[in-house]
Amino acid sequence: MELHQLIAHKEKRWRATLLVMLAVLLVLSALYLMVGEVFLSPFSSLSSFEHKLLVDLRLPRLMAAMVIGAALAVSGATLQVLLGNVLAEPGVLGISGGASLAMVIALFLLPVMPTPTVFMLAAIIGALVFTLILVGMARAMHLSTSRMLLVGVALGILSGAFVTWAFYFSDDLSLRQLMYWLMGSIGGASWHHHMVTLVLLPVLVWLCLQGQTLDKLMLGETHAVQLGVDVHKVRWRLILAVSILIGCAVALGGIISFVGLVVPHLLRMAFGSENRFLLPLSAFAGATLLVFSDIWARTLLDSAELPLGVMTTTIGAPIFIWMLIRSHDAH
């Protein structure tokens, strides 16, 4: 097979996979809107209560699952290129923890309950600070994969400790509700909270279009400069975009781990590392994974609802362990 035929075949395979993923997402979305404590049949007219349940509860929650899953998956894929580490992920590296810590600080310092916009800004600042710490340490100290993971885990533990202290000394009910939410939950998502989505979506689309630039960065700084990339400027733009996505995702749904690790890594294993295709496919696959996980979180138990973060951790942790073993065997 000639080179141009091979490239055309590969592009066709990526596009076919993208269409299949979109179809799966649409089917799961329809199922998501139907199932729950009250089953909504698509073949019968809805009562006023059922219509309100669909429009005011299930639809905004479905949208939250989609945008959070897409944002985390694309952020993970971008971080893996920026840090040169296939195991990089916002939750594992402690970046999500930094966003949650900033939100708790905002909750303590402000005299009134912060609005979703204030929470979002605090989360973005926290994610940006932790991302800069990681990128700075990785570049200055030339950290190996294992050492970078240790630094990320340490940052996550540190932020988690501060958050736990804050909850322990607080009698405020809102803080206790926030603690459940920080475990990863979109149960309280409403249209009001989707002000955050208005900020997230343009950044997500922009980042999905940066695939060719990321492909050049993967060749190394020297080659990227020769190919016309302003590496310094591009790196800072990508860091800011990733921080905005992670901050918005945490503000909307709390800490949801492993989506940004599992989705891009499995897609790379199956289809290759071309970021111009990988990033859009990661967005659809991340959205699909989170919609699927939240269906299980809502329906697995009759008497309670599981935090979404628990479901993604249950799915992602075994895959993460397998990836660590595989990485060790490769060396």
Curated annotation (Swiss-Prot):
GO cellular component: a single term: plasma membrane
Gene3D superfamilies tied to this protein: ABC transporter involved in vitamin B12 uptake, BtuC
Topological type in the membrane: Multi-pass membrane protein
Keyword Repressor: no
CDD domains xrefs: TM_ABC_iron-siderophores_like
Listed InterPro entries: ABC_BtuC-like, ABC_transptr_BtuC, ABC_transptr_permease_BtuC
Primary subcellular site in the record, as a coarse category: membrane
GO terms under biological process: cobalamin transport
Entry keyword set: Cell inner membrane, Cell membrane, Membrane, Transmembrane, Transmembrane helix, Transport
Subcellular localization, as worded in the UniProt entry: Cell inner membrane
Recorded superkingdom: Bacteria
SUPFAM superfamilies for this protein: ABC transporter involved in vitamin B12 uptake, BtuC (SSF81345)
One Pfam family cited in the UniProt record for this chain: FecCD
Keyword Transport: yes
GO molecular-function terms, A-Z: vitamin transmembrane transporter activity
Transmembrane regions listed in the UniProt entry: 20-42, 62-84, 91-113, 117-136, 148-170, 190-209, 240-262, 277-296, 303-325
The protein's assembly and partners: The complex is composed of two ATP-binding proteins (BtuD), two transmembrane proteins (BtuC) and a solute-binding protein (BtuF).
Reported function: Part of the ABC transporter complex BtuCDF involved in vitamin B12 import. Involved in the translocation of the substrate across the membrane.
Family of this protein: Belongs to the binding-protein-dependent transport system permease family. FecCD subfamily.
Protein's name according to its UniProt entry: Vitamin B12 import system permease protein BtuC
Gene: btuC
